[in-house]
Amino acid sequence: MSILPIIKGEYKKDYNLKHLTWFKVGGNAEIFFKPFDFADLKSFLIQNKQKLPITTFGSGSNIIIRDGGIEGVVIKLGQNFNKIEFLDNHLIVGSSCLNYNLARFCQANAISGFEFLVGIPGTIGGGVIMNAGAYGSAFQDIIVQVEALDFSGNFLTFTNKEIGFKYRGNNLPKDLILLKAVFKVNKGDSQNILLKMNKINNTRSSTQPIKERTGGSTFINPEGRKSWELIDKAGLRGYRIGGASISELHCNFMINNGNATAKDLEDLGNFVRQKVFEDSGVELNWEIKRIGKYV
């Protein structure tokens, strides 16, 4: 391990990440770093000179951390990176702000177009990276630009076009830490916005296992198809490997039944991919990110 950069925030060595993920599985971070503020993060990156490998971490909602943990430094942005501000008819939102919190803020301030965020777990930063979407809307529809630091500490901005949004992804460089997202503002009726959000919440609670240890949608929907239908057709509803299972309620969700390992979940996902391909000839692609070392 190289000498760690001098910081104002805090380091934690051999830090268990399991409790930070929705699946509640996975190994430790070799070094866990929460920057104090923007200047602290920038200083760390400049001092590091890309010597230590860096992994960024959001709310842990759409990720499997493998049981062997993560080498290098895991960076998690905290409360100093979750602010919501108005400026010139735009919203400027910190990347660690939860999607749900932004949806609630917009409802309270009669801003329309953000209703779908109430049903998307995770942070704004993760939502941008995934081009997260639901109910006919996605991040690409509301983003103006993003602000970021690269792993060398250079400050960069990217417009909506430069981000290169695509279905559940983008064309941004991989060595970025997103800091803020700028959104366009369209005024609406607060009560109508609330009704839309309540409808989304009701739909989610009746069709998705939101009270279970899950990580959201497991696979990207193939063009013109639904992953859950393909999984169900392959006879895998409720299928188990170790402590992991396919949800009985929604086949595109995996569940930790209480004692699953990251390996159980990843093995289950790969088994599903194999069986769906054998049954339908369709190759499912992971939506859930898998990172870290195998044991």
From Swiss-Prot:
Pathway where it operates: Cell wall biogenesis; peptidoglycan biosynthesis
Asked if Transmembrane is a keyword of the record, the answer is no
Q: What is its EC number?
A: 1.3.1.98
Q: Could you tell me which Gene3D superfamilies the record lists for this protein?
A: 3.30.465.10, UDP-N-acetylenolpyruvoylglucosamine reductase, C-terminal domain, Uridine Diphospho-n-acetylenolpyruvylglucosamine Reductase, domain 2
Which residues are catalytic? R168, S217 (proton donor), E287
* Cofactor or coenzyme needed: FAD
Q: Does Cell cycle count among this protein's keywords?
A: yes
* One Gene Ontology cellular component annotation held by this UniProt entry: cytosol
Protein name (record): UDP-N-acetylenolpyruvoylglucosamine reductase
Q: In the UniProt record, what gene is named as encoding this protein?
A: murB
